[in-house]
Amino acid sequence: MAKFIFVTGGVVSGLGKGITASSIGALLKASGLKVFMQKFDPYLNVDPGTMSPYQHGEVFVTKDGGETDLDLGHYERFIDEELTKLSSTTSGKIYLSVIQGERKGVNSGKTIQVVPHITDAIKQKVYQAAKQSQADVIISEIGGTVGDIESQPFIEAIRQIRLEQGKENVMFVHVVLLLWLAASKEYKTKPIQNSVKAMASLGIQPDVIVCRSDSSSPKDIKEKISLFCNVPITNIIDAIDQDSIYRVPLALAKQNLQDIIIEQLQLKAKNIDLSLWKQFNKKIDSSTEEIEISFVGKYIELQDAYLSVLESLKIAGWEFNKKIKIRWVQADKLDESNYKEVLKNSQGILVPGGFGKRGIEGMMLASRYARENDIPYLGICLGMQIATISIARDLLNWSDADSTEFNKNTTHPIFDYIKGIDRDNIGGTLRLGTMVTKLEKNSLVSKLYNSDIALERHRHRYEFNNEYKKDLESVGLRFSGIYEEKNIVEVVEMPSLKFFVASQFHPEFTSRPNKPTPLFKGFIKAIVENNK
């Protein structure tokens, strides 16, 4: 029978509930337990797939094509497990399923209410995750802050789960902000007390309180929190600021958080083995020399829009004992008059994914600069498309070469809608999830993967137009990765250059600590070797 841990947040949002939940998952997995994780978001969107990156940040894609919250990227990287659509549920998805059921008459004419119908649907997602994953522990993060009106159905649902399953099977971890007032030089615990009281008014008593702060809390402060929040002092855990999120599991392990959980939930665990985490942290410690990468994107004002790409770069850098320094370049501010000066001294250039016309010309200039100066280049999704279009314009002299996404009237549509895709609806209509890419023998990408196939995830609705393959091959572009089932181009490269590789798929979604994705590892290796 699965055990359940629910992670909630109080006082303010943005405290790092996702990192806390991920770290708990990492500690339990290091204790020999099978872990599954999920996120409940209170917003009414069905999923984040149609949300602006400025509103939501990155859309993380699961292996089965779920468009999910960026916290799932943390989950997968920390517990090194592939999650599914079951790992991401929104209020919108819950309400939609309940209302659709009502329209079909499955409720036998009953009045549809938040309790029990919405709460039952939420509980079903939790129990379904336990059944399908067969995990020892299900860790569920509840988005938002306790007290938010949007979160109340989720709080009520997890209260009911505790009632149904018992304290020995359900645990509540509450993440809060411990305030430090610099003027009076003292900690203030009242916001924590009020947050716990708000939870108590909803029928939930936290078992563990995780205090976010920039330094360890004194014993008397922990005693005060323990007294007024009715939580044992041993269960008041410090979560202090770290220079890397990958230090958090070790910091929590030092406070025996895993033992507290294992004891309450009566889990049959092994002695914890943190050797991989310690090894990874040693890599971080030894990475002092910087390499600078120009990151040419559309949404750089919100770096969370590229979270998995950034983490993948860091992970690959640490593999070579290098610290990654990002030079942020706003794509729509690059033009013919300034791109050479802006990109001068770049050790590597990366163009990530995105949608829409804005910034496209600047991205093409970045791709051209990398190609003409033999600077290692990695293009992802849109970055692959603009690299290919740039080659068509510059080397084939097709000045109007484009994608029909940006110019429906182009006479050289290098990229067009994927055949059979829904053009009328936006949500859930992309080519999504893990696909098998066949890699061409002796290509650079096949050497990087050390295989003739790559299993990577996708999120796009435009594909390369195969009518132009021979023309582009004639100027040196190699089509080294193909989705054979539908003859979709997945990877292109320029063999004449040190490293010029671009993929339609998103390799950032499969990077893990100690296991960088081959494309990122190859990209960083090329930069290191190019700067010896």
Swiss-Prot record:
Mg(2+) binds at residues 71, 141. Pfam families: CTP_synth_N (PF06418), GATase (PF00117). It comes from Mycoplasma mycoides subsp. mycoides SC (strain CCUG 32753 / NCTC 10114 / PG1). Allosterically activated by GTP, when glutamine is the substrate; GTP has no effect on the reaction when ammonia is the substrate. The allosteric effector GTP functions by stabilizing the protein conformation that binds the tetrahedral intermediate(s) formed during glutamine hydrolysis. Inhibited by the product CTP, via allosteric rather than competitive inhibition. The keyword Metal-binding applies. Keywords: ATP-binding, Glutamine amidotransferase, Ligase, Magnesium, Metal-binding, Nucleotide-binding, Pyrimidine biosynthesis. Coiled coil: none annotated. Belongs to the CTP synthase family. This is CTP synthase. Homotetramer. The lineage of its organism: Bacteria, Bacillati, Mycoplasmatota, Mollicutes, Mycoplasmataceae. L-glutamine binds at residues 54, 354, 382-385, 405, 461. InterPro entries: Class_I_gatase-like, CTP_synthase, CTP_synthase_N, GATASE, GATase1_CTP_Synthase, P-loop_NTPase. GO terms for molecular function: ATP binding; CTP synthase activity; glutaminase activity; identical protein binding; metal ion binding. Catalyzes the ATP-dependent amination of UTP to CTP with either L-glutamine or ammonia as the source of nitrogen. Regulates intracellular CTP levels through interactions with the four ribonucleotide triphosphates. The active site is at 381 (nucleophile), 506, 508. HAMAP family: PyrG. UTP binds at residues 13, 188-193, 224.
